[in-house]
């Protein structure tokens, strides 16, 4: 399957959470295509620094707003019709699940409904960024899109898991009832420049600890696995879904699976650090293994990640080295 580029010069795109880690890279790619991009962010976890290089760009507008309160229609950039809406706004790290639980639930529910209504009104393509967390602690491996998941609905992670599952259900309801042109992407573990050093996820934590010469804290036995995807590959996958007419959900990530111990040791090696690995108590509801089945992404979108873990981690380490001084 070859997907033809559908959105480019002359198209107006709204990206929610646009100053966040993944969305800011997506904004870069859309600007490079010739799109006019409006990024909306309330900066709860996003950073103006991530889009500072675009502030003077004639086809970029940054609007500070909480999409859970609705889009600020008084803003000229918001009032004009959009050709596509990409909903990526949400705190997404383990530390956020405990510190921002209500915000996560609101942006996954109320904000999603506001944005779906706007997409219907504008006749826009709507892309909803879901997550591998929709599968919970999976009993199926690798995870296919047909798997319904194994989610604890009242656990510490549930605010994120269930918010995304609600967003998926809402998107499909609008697709079926209103005929909305919509697509759902289930994003697997992604890493790269612009991640927050303190966001609680394994890769930024391990890199920060290694660069500081501190012990690498691995939760549990370190045998848990993740498939790690470099952000550029993920962005390519999201753009393929945007350009397509696929509804999904479609997994996006990489099938390269590593244990947490292997990941820690690779980061220690790439940083040249003398850090040791220290095992600490495992967090609640931490999935044992996670790897996407990418058959659907390959067949329907022609998706194929290209950045190896070693190369992607090198680029990420370089970014963190500059950021941490």
Each PLM stretch: what is its role?
Residues 46-48, 136-137, 194, 260, ...:
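A short beta-to-alpha transition loop/helix N-cap that caps and shapes the active-site region
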Residues 200-204, 235:
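Conserved terminal C-lobe alpha helix of the protein kinase catalytic domain
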Residues 48-51, 168, 204, 261, ...:
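Short, surface-exposed alpha-helical segments at coil->helix boundaries
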Residues 1-190, 232, 307, 319:
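N-terminal Rossmann-like NAD(P)+-binding domain of SDR-like oxidoreductases, especially those catalyzing
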Residues 6-7, 13, 24-32, 65-66, ...:
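C-terminal substrate-binding subdomain of Rossmann-fold SDR/epimerase-dehydratase oxidoreductases
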Residues 19-22, 48, 110, 138, ...:
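Gly/Ser/Thr-rich beta-alpha loop segments that engage phosphate groups in nucleotides
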């Amino acid at each position: 399957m070859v997907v033809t580029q559908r959105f480019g010069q002359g198209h107006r795109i709204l990206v929610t959470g646009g100053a966040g880690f993944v969305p800011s890279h997506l904004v870069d790619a859309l600007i490079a295509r010739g799109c006019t991009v409006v990024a909306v962010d309330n900066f709860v976890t996003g950073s103006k620094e991530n889009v500072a290089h675009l502030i003077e760009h004639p086809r970029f507008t940054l609007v500070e707003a909480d999409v859970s309160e609705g889009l600020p229609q008084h803003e000229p950039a918001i009032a004009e019709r959009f050709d596509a809406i990409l909903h990526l706004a949400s705190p997404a790290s383990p530390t956020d699940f405990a510190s921002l639980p209500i915000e996560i639930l609101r942006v996954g529910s109320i904000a999603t409904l506001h944005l779906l209504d706007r997409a219907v009104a504008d006749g826009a393509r709507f892309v909803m960024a879901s997550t591998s967390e929709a599968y919970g602690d999976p009993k199926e491996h690798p995870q296919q899109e047909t798997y319904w998941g194994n989610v604890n609905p009242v656990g510490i992670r549930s605010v994120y898991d269930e918010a995304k599952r609600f967003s998926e259900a809402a998107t499909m309801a609008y697709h079926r009832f209103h005929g909305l042109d919509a697509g759902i992407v289930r994003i697997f573990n992604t890493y790269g420049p612009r991640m927050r050093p303190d966001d609680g996820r394994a890769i930024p934590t391990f890199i920060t600890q290694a660069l500081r010469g501190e012990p690498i804290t691995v939760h549990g036995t370190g045998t848990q696995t993740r498939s790690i995807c470099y952000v550029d590959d993920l962005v390519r996958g999201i753009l393929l879904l945007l350009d397509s007419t696929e509804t999904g959900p479609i997994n996006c990530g990489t099938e390269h699976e590593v244990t947490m111990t292997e990941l820690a040791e690779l980061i220690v090696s790439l940083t040249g650090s003398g850090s040791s690995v220290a095992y600490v108590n495992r967090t609640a509801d931490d999935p044992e293994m996670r790897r996407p089945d990418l058959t659907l992404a390959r067949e329907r979108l022609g998706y194929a990640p290209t950045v190896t873990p070693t190369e992607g981690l090198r680029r990420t380490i370089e970014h963190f080295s500059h950021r941490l001084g």
